[in-house]
Amino acid sequence: MSRVSQARNLGKYFLLIDNMLVVLGFFVVFPLISIRFVDQMGWAAVMVGIALGLRQFIQQGLGIFGGAIADRFGAKPMIVTGMLMRAAGFATMGIAHEPWLLWFSCFLSGLGGTLFDPPRSALVVKLIRPEQRGRFFSLLMMQDSAGAVIGALLGSWLLQYDFRLVCATGAILFILCALFNAWLLPAWKLSTVRTPVREGMRRVMSDKRFVTYVLTLAGYYMLAVQVMLMLPIMVNDIAGSPAAVKWMYAIEACLSLTLLYPIARWSEKRFRLEHRLMAGLLVMSLSMIPIGMVGNLQQLFTLICAFYIGSVIAEPARETLSASLADARARGSYMGFSRLGLAIGGAIGYIGGGWLFDMGKALAQPELPWMMLGIIGFITFLALGWQFSHKRTPRRMLEPGA
């Protein structure tokens, strides 16, 4: 086995272990933020939505800067620094009793993510061969789902005692992850050339096809982020207990572990990437619309199942399509900019979703936020269809598994 092949194989295992630690640390804390501050402390949902939206926008909106810096200086220092900064954010969150302190903790957490997320994504593109990326992204998503359940279960159990224990556990996991990267991650360069920061950013911004694709995904993310805000609140409201939230993530884990990899393997040779993304988005949009009209957990969990199935179809295709469009000369910059859609969509989804949720309650129209999200999903579906029409899209992008 050549040294390059050996490095790729070892790199896969490193990425999987690193991803599990990050997912556990994140999901111990974030799914419980809305439960803690809305249900237990009585804050308005929009106040928590601002905090979550701020974290999302800082982490993803500034991702191009984190990616460009990583292109220049390498992945390791950015990843280690970012993970320690997120740990500090979680520690601050544990003592948050005023909105401004929660916002500050989410700012720190998001800034840490800005530093470590783009270089981690670029390492996947660097180490995984193009023909294997779709399946590897599916494996990462399966890990995400399993880690989400384990993290949510652990966080829910700790929340019975003290929210500070929840935040301390998340902080410790990110400190362990920082030490893991500091010890084992080689000083790899992300790009094929040592790209100056401004050059990497210029290369991305001049790629109109990539920019259009990323901005279009903002609508997709407005729906996707509700698993952190409105869906947990809805489950808690109907069940009457935050303990039921863990079953929401258990559903996601079961569906992901059983369907993600088989669907990715089956569809990658039969359907184009953008068609898989659009099909998943359509299922997600259709499942959102009736949520505000359900009256029991069985109906709600059925719709959540449909939503997660749409995500299972869409997510591997979205990640693979983003990676396939990245220029190898500026991988970090491209993967950083690819998060801008999540920054915009996530911020609007959190803040707007929280505002609409409060408004729906005030007007006695609980279906209002869910109907709006469904409409946004349909508009995004049409926009993607227009962008990837045969007349507009180069043939190479449209091939299955491209």
Curated annotation (Swiss-Prot):
Entry's transmembrane regions: 13-33, 99-116, 139-159, 165-185, 214-234, 244-264, 277-297, 300-320, 340-360, 368-388
Family: Belongs to the major facilitator superfamily. DHA1 family. MdtH (TC 2.A.1.2.21) subfamily.
Organism encoding this protein: Salmonella schwarzengrund (strain CVM19633)
Protein name: Multidrug resistance protein MdtH
NCBIfam families for this protein: PRK11646.1
Keyword Zinc found: no
GO molecular function, one term: transmembrane transporter activity
Main location group: membrane
Segments in the Cytoplasmic topological domain: 1-12, 117-138, 186-213, 265-276, 321-339, 389-402
Biological classification of the source: Bacteria, Pseudomonadati, Pseudomonadota, Gammaproteobacteria, Enterobacterales
Topological domain spans for side Periplasmic: 34-98, 160-164, 235-243, 298-299, 361-367
Keyword Secreted in record: no
Membrane association type: Multi-pass membrane protein
Keywords from the named record: Cell inner membrane, Cell membrane, Membrane, Transmembrane, Transmembrane helix, Transport
Locations listed in the record: Cell inner membrane
CC per GO annotation: plasma membrane
InterPro entries: MFS, MFS_dom, MFS_trans_sf, MFS_Transporters, Multidrug-R_MdtH
